Amino acid sequence: EAEPKPFNPVCYEPKEVGPCKAYVP
C-alpha cells in the first residue's frame, strides 16, 4: 500500500476482504 491504486469497477461491490476492499467507496 505504498501508492493508491486506480478505482477498479470490477471491485465495486461489498467485500470484507481482499484488495478490492481498498477500491470500494
Curated annotation (Swiss-Prot):
Entry keywords, A to Z: Disulfide bond, Protease inhibitor, Serine protease inhibitor
The keyword Transcription belongs to this UniProt entry's keyword annotation: no
Molecular function GO labels: serine-type endopeptidase inhibitor activity
Site (Reactive bond): K21, A22
Functional summary from the UniProt entry: Serine protease inhibitor. Inhibits trypsin, elastase and plasmin. Does not inhibit kallikrein.
Protein name, entry field: Kunitz-type serine protease inhibitor RsTIS5
Residue stretches making up the BPTI/Kunitz inhibitor domain: 1-25
